[in-house]
């Protein structure tokens, strides 16, 4: 388990705590774990949970100032989606390998937050603790195939003008996949993601269709 794995374990544990604690005024404490990211002055973190209606829904974090628009009843779904898209405008990310890794974790958070119906297709299982691999859908009762027991570790590589983040994960309709994306900072520290790729290392389809 490397340092990225360890931070991933902490991140998932914190996610589950935040989802389960509806009494919290804000979700700002996520950045006690993602400690290479901080909110800009006056900003707070909120969490919109998937609604169990319609053909599918997902959950996401968003930022706000003043009162939480979801709690005071002034938010609509499109407003929260817009806040989600621009969440990094209200965050300061350290330009380090660990900062890039934590930005990736936040970027992928909808895939580990609660999902409803068709949105389950985006769900991921991460293997920050390699023992978790034995608990995923196809291998609960069957041995893990030898060729995928050696799962690549998460990694972050710094290039001249960007970071490359790679992370293995499992999806019940793709199999074992290696995520790869580029993360860049402009001269003002604003962050952007591009060249997002998913390479299938071991193909699997659960057969479940929504």
Give names to the regions the model predicted.
Residues 1-145:
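Extended, low-hydrophobicity segments enriched in charged/polar residues
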Residues 17-20, 73, 123, 150-156, ...:
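Short, flexible coil/linker elements and helix-boundary hinge sites characteristic
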Residues 26, 30-33, 154-158, 165, ...:
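Generic structural motif
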Residues 29, 59, 109-111, 155, ...:
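Generic serine detector
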Residues 33-36, 52, 156, 179-185:
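Assembly/interface hotspot detector across virion components, adhesins/toxins, and nucleic-acid enzymes
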Residues 50, 64-65, 129, 157-159, ...:
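A structural detector for beta-sheet-dominated domains
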Residues 125-177:
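Acidic, glycine-rich flexible loop segments
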Residues 163-210:
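C-terminal, beta-strand-rich globular interaction domains
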């Amino acid at each position: 388990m490397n340092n990225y794995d360890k931070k991933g374990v902490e991140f998932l544990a914190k996610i589950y705590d935040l989802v389960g604690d509806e009494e919290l005024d804000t979700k700002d404490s996520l950045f006690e774990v993602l400690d290479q990211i901080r909110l800009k002055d006056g900003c707070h973190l909120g969490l919109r949970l998937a609604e169990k209606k319609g053909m599918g829904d997902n959950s996401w974090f968003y930022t706000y100032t003043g009162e939480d628009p979801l709690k005071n009843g002034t938010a609509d779904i499109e407003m929260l989606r817009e806040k989600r898209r621009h969440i990094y405008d209200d965050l300061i990310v350290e330009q380090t390998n660990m900062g890039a890794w934590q930005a990736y974790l936040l970027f992928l958070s909808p895939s580990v937050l609660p999902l409803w119906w068709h949105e389950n297709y985006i769900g991921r299982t991460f293997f920050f603790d390699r023992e978790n691999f034995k608990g995923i859908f196809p291998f609960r009762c069957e041995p893990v195939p030898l060729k995928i027991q050696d799962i690549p570790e998460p990694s972050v590589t710094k290039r001249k003008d960007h970071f490359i983040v790679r992370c293995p994960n499992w999806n019940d309709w793709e199999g074992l996949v290696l995520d790869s994306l580029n993360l860049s900072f402009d001269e003002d520290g604003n962050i952007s993601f591009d060249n997002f790729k998913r390479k299938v290392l071991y193909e699997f389809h659960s057969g479940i269709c929504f």
